A protein has these predicted regions:
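A conserved acidic beta->alpha catalytic loop
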Residues: 34-46
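C-terminal catalytic/acceptor-binding lobe
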Residues: 171-233
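Short beta-strand-to-loop acidic/aromatic patch adjacent to the donor-nucleotide binding site
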Residues: 86-97
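Hydrophobic targeting segments
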Residues: 4-10, 26, 30-34
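Short, well-formed alpha-helical segments that are part of the catalytic scaffolds
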Residues: 14-28
Length: 233
């Protein structure tokens, strides 16, 4: 029987144009907005959207003075909440637009035995698989069991994974944890699935424009990465 208990969390730091598109595409779902130190003006707008769409909005600035990104806090808080409520946890990034059937498909695949993570492949507006799943361009369309990392662009972590994997193993000096959790899921005996026939639209790094330098000016990107201690995965 399908587990109908789940939470969708959308981490947002400013970039309201793409974030609003993400939130509206999820209308009717159980969504938690993770407002990770957006400006006061954008925070107000996020609360307006939350009220309109009947979402919950968590202001991270009220929980910690740690600078964005606060993914580790998100993962610890939401894991505890999901376990208490016997729920799966779905992360949808604020630069992703889901389709009408995306969430139901993730949930359906999550009911297979020994599944840890289920991710929707990402595409651009032309229908070409894009970052971070370029490696999947050679795959057939369908349900792919993979040992490669799954991004948090649009990914479900099953209740089974949340119970089995202790997030206290995560390195607090890092900022992003999709690589680590993908590995821990496999090491715990679970299978990670990539759905190459269930694409979502992805507009990479809309909330962190400096990361576009990785493709346009790689030297500047790596200088900022090292000098400002950014983008640690």
């Amino acid at each position: 029987m399908q587990n109908n208990h789940y939470h969708i969390i959308v981490p947002i730091k400013d970039s309201l144009e793409t974030a609003e598109r993400t939130l509206r595409a999820l209308q009717g779902e159980r969504v938690i907005i993770w407002n990770d130190n957006s400006t006061s003006e954008n925070t107000q707008r996020l609360h307006e959207l939350a009220a309109e769409l009947q979402y919950e909005c968590i202001d991270v600035a009220k929980l910690t003075d740690h600078p964005s990104p606060n993914y580790l806090l998100l993962l610890h808080m939401m894991r505890e909440r999901a376990i208490q409520e016997n729920a799966h946890l779905i992360i949808v990034e604020s630069d992703v637009v889901v389709g009408d059937a995306t969430i139901s498909r993730l949930l359906r695949e999550a009911e297979e035995d020994n599944v840890g993570m289920v991710a929707a492949v990402t595409e651009d507006d032309m229908g070409t698989i894009n970052f971070p799943y370029e490696y999947a361009r050679r795959y057939e369309r369908g349900r792919i069991a993979t040992r490669k990392r799954l991004s948090f662009c649009c990914t479900l972590m099953t209740l089974q994974l949340l119970k089995r994997v202790d997030f206290n193993q995560l390195d607090p000096d890092k900022q992003w944890f999709d690589v680590t959790i993908s590995k821990l899921s496999r090491e715990s005996g679970l299978t990670n699935l990539l759905l190459t026939d269930c694409p979502v639209r992805h507009y990479p790094h809309s909330s962190r424009p400096w990361k576009q330098l990785k493709y346009t000016h790689p030297l500047r990107y790596y200088w900022q990465k090292l000098f400002y201690d950014r983008d640690k995965i």
